[in-house]
Design a protein with these regions (language model features):
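Hydrophobic anchor at the beta1->P-loop junction of P-loop NTPases
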Residues: 5
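P-loop (Walker A) phosphate-binding loop of NTP-binding proteins
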Residues: 8
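ATP-binding Walker
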Residues: 11
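Walker A/P-loop
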Residues: 14
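Post-Walker A helix-loop "phosphate-sensing" segment adjacent to the P-loop in P-loop NTPases
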Residues: 22-30
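ATP-dependent small-molecule kinase phosphotransfer cores
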Residues: 33-90, 94-98
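Conserved phosphate-donor/acceptor-positioning beta-strand/loop module used by diverse small-molecule
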Residues: 89-96, 109-132
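Small-molecule kinase domains that catalyze NTP-dependent phosphoryl transfer to phosphate-bearing small molecules
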Residues: 132-193
Length: 193
């Protein structure tokens, strides 16, 4: 099974991914980026590549769902997302654009696997508290919210038309341990296709 997590900044995607890895035996799909490692960031969270290496991976077709954000490039290594090995269940964090690319341009990955798309939502107060806790400045949090308002303009709100339908929409739950994946997934709302 391939689980795709998406949601705005500070919605708990990384925390939920960590829970799936540690408690459910999932493999965390490691993405590639040209941005530098943040202070205190674990080297295993990304493949940190120089611009030239990233471009070479992209030209070879080794990267999927490539996007640019604030001048830094991000992509998903094909072998990471298709890896099955000893941990057949994988979890990846994608942007809405990444999900659209996965659905429209990579049917080989989708048909070879069960695919679940989970949208994690967050309210403003909780998101801001989480950003502060992880050391983001208020300015950085507001910048992220502005970017999210563009990236997620088609996502959960009343009478919304979705570009794609997530399998589950999880409301903001302050305790990430309340998030569980199938069959123990807390099913908050199911959107009909």
């Amino acid at each position: 099974m391939l689980v795709v997590l998406l949601g705005p900044s500070c919605s708990g995607k990384s925390t939920f991914q960590k829970e799936l890895v540690e408690n459910e035996g999932y493999h965390a799909v490691r993405t590639a980026t040209t941005r530098p490692k943040r202070v205190g960031e674990d080297l295993s969270s990304y493949y940190f590549l120089k611009d030239q290496s990233f471009a070479e991976w992209e030209v070879r077709g080794d990267l999927l769902c490539v996007e640019t954000f604030r001048g830094w490039r991000y992509g998903v290594p094909r072998d990471e997302i298709t890896r099955r090995g000893g941990r057949p269940n994988r979890v990846v964090i994608l942007t809405p654009g990444g999900v659209m690319e996965l659905l429209s341009r990579h049917p080989d990955i989708i048909t070879a696997d069960a695919l679940s798309i989970l949208y994690l939502g967050v309210d403003g107060a909780t998101g801001e508290a989480r950003a502060c806790k992880r050391g983001d400045s208020r300015r950085e949090y507001l910048r992220r919210m502005a970017a999210d308002s563009i990236d997620f303009r088609h996502y959960p709100r009343e009478n919304c038309v979705w570009e794609f339908t997530p399998d589950y929409i999880l409301d903001c739950i302050n305790n990430p341990q309340n998030y569980k994946l199938k069959p123990r997934l807390k099913r908050v709302e199911r959107k009909r296709k």
